[in-house]
Amino acid sequence: MREGRILRMHIMRPTWHFIAAEDVRWMLHLSARRIRAANASFAKGNGCGLDEGDYLRCSRLLERILGGGNHLTRQQIAGELERAGMAVDAPRLNRLMMHAETDGVVCSGADRAGKPTYALLAERVPQAVDLPEEEALALLALRYFRSHSPATFDDFVWWSGLPVGQAR
């Protein structure tokens, strides 16, 4: 993880997953839209009051504060966002950071004093492969069934968070 070959991200569901850095782009393209929808629903239901303008502003601020290989903890990022005038209690910060992950702005950085950090994905993994959707779905299914067999199609759908129609 320190070197960035393995990343910790919300990649298949709104749950932390460890993935190979070279897989991040195609996996994000498969799952980002659903994770953002779940994230938005949760934010709305919990009164976070976030909109697309907030997410865009946060992403721009993250690009500035994490640029140049700067890896910061959540607490440090919260402080920087607050200094820039954004309200960032824990629920809002969770939603903002998950959205930035699914937009491909941030990913896990190198731990600092035993605490996880965030870094810019473009700096941490500048050359990640992207795949057409059909190829990405086939690769995801192949990897799942090789590592989780015996397993059923329903197991794969649950694990991946994919809609049944897309998983077929």
Labelled PLM ranges:
Residues M1-R168:
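Long, low-complexity intrinsically disordered regions
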